Amino acid sequence: MNDPLWKKGEYFKDNERPERGLSVARMIAHITYLSEDAMHRKFGRKLQSRDIISFGFDADFQVESYLRYQGQSFVDRFDANSYLYLTRAMDYFDNYEQFKKNIEFSHTPNEHLKYLIISFTSDWLFPSQESKIIVNQLN
């Protein structure tokens, strides 16, 4: 929303898309898709196409190159306003709160239900700790 081309979501009038802001937003969000351990295993501090650090603003590290690619490829196929609405919906979603509202209903007498709770240790949006809380409540 700080991209000057966003224009409070009215960017279609001038046919100029807020690509910089959308690209940076995607790069930041993409970091949350991998845990710190996963990022370290995948990239560490490996250099991208060079033997020494340039101390410039080009992508010295593989992780920089990867995130820039993710950001740029995203603006080619996604709309900034759509991304804002999707990320806002994710902000408001609370898996555990939804679970608590439904747990009493799902534990009616004589009901034989099986549950499968799957989590990924690399998931920052829905951490494994939250899944463990749900499993404990189901037991």
Give the positions of each predicted feature.
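Acidic catalytic loop of the alpha/beta-hydrolase fold
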Residues: 73, 121-126
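Short alpha-helix in the alpha/beta-hydrolase fold that links the catalytic acid
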Residues: 45, 98-103, 127-137
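Alpha/beta-hydrolase-fold enzymes
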Residues: 1-73
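Helix-enriched interaction subdomains in cytosolic or periplasmic regions
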Residues: 72-81
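Flexible loop/turn segments at secondary-structure boundaries
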Residues: 92-94, 124-128
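Active-site nucleophile elbow and catalytic-triad environment of alpha/beta-hydrolase enzymes
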Residues: 69-70, 84-107
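Short, conserved loop/helix-junction motifs that constitute active-site signature segments
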Residues: 105-112, 138-139
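Short beta-strand/loop motif that positions the catalytic acidic residue
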Residues: 111, 117-119
